[in-house]
Amino acid sequence: MPFMTRKLTLVLTAGLTAAAWQPPILAHTPAANLFDAHVALGLPQAFALPRETDDERGPGVDEVVIKERLDTDAAYPDGSHATTYAGTAGSHEAVFTRLGPTLSVSVLGQSVEAGATIARHRSAPAPGQDDVIVPSFAQPARIHAALTDHPPAELRFWIFLHDDAGESNYAKFHNWYVAWWIRDMEKTVKPGIPVKVIIKDHLPGVTDFDYRQGRRDESLFAFRSAADGYLYEQGVMPSALTKVMLFVGDRPDNWKGAYGIAIPRDTVAMASGTGPRHGVAHEFGHTLNAQHEYAETRFPCVTNMSAYVPGLFSCQIYSGQNDVQIREYVQQTVEREAH
């Protein structure tokens, strides 16, 4: 009998220990619960939505209309997936994101950069014109046809959060950089194939990459190699339709004053968290053949490929011509890789 008692005690102890390792179940916020209840009834839905306590616009209540759920998948390092909806908040177009226990709202056409409640100040100038890297003969741009005989059915964007970026709040990162960009890509740019965004962090050899050393073109090529190595390990064949970005904290001296760098019509880019809200969209835009010359100033904001215009905020869209540039690039790349 003592043996049986001890055995039972060990089993119970092991069970309690295993239970202690289960991830905590986080309570959803009141706004998130209200949002979920209305969306569950089917779309569209119109209702009054109180803002989250950390809403970038401050406290308040919005009359919202949730029109549709977007198809684009955004996967985060903890295994969570952002669910993104398009609609309106008041008189403005808006994007609503459910990620984890919270609800985030990104309102287009409103300047919130100066007062945004993000981990650090996000109202820095937009990327300068010196962020485009022209490959040399010694380090050629990637040849699309040589990548893989089986191109993905998706336009994939891998964002690697550098260890020094300080981006541990995935919901805020998604709301600030990704949610509205997903909406624009899916609803306006319309590349013709599905879009997927994958965010990763804490990957030795990738997210601890030393981007401060050497020339910036050397840094880009070296990171592209490191990221491609990781993709191979995960069973993902690099492709001209698979883009990679290193998202860093402070911009290094070797960027020569830019808030990001990219190789046009290639697969690699870098962006700094000290830059503007459209920094990620800007640098990825270069890899999709979007160009500075087609950027527009739409007072009081600038489109994604614009250089710095003092006093203006991010429109959170590409210009009409850059929509065409991206659409044609993707279509031509799909056709090229299919042969």
Regions found by a protein language model. Name each.
Residues 1-5:
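N-terminal secretory signal peptides that target proteins for export/translocation
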Residues 6-21:
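Gram-negative bacterial Sec-dependent N-terminal signal peptides
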Residues 10-11, 23-107:
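N-terminal prosegments of processed precursors
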Residues 66, 85-87, 94-96, 103-105, ...:
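Hydrophobic beta-strand residues in large extracellular and virion-surface proteins
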Residues 87-160:
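Non-catalytic propeptide/linker segments at domain boundaries
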Residues 97-104, 115-121, 172-175, 253-271:
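Surface-exposed flexible segments
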Residues 133-260:
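Fold-level signature of zinc-dependent metallopeptidase catalytic domains
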Residues 263-339:
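The catalytic-center signature of Zn2+-dependent metalloproteases
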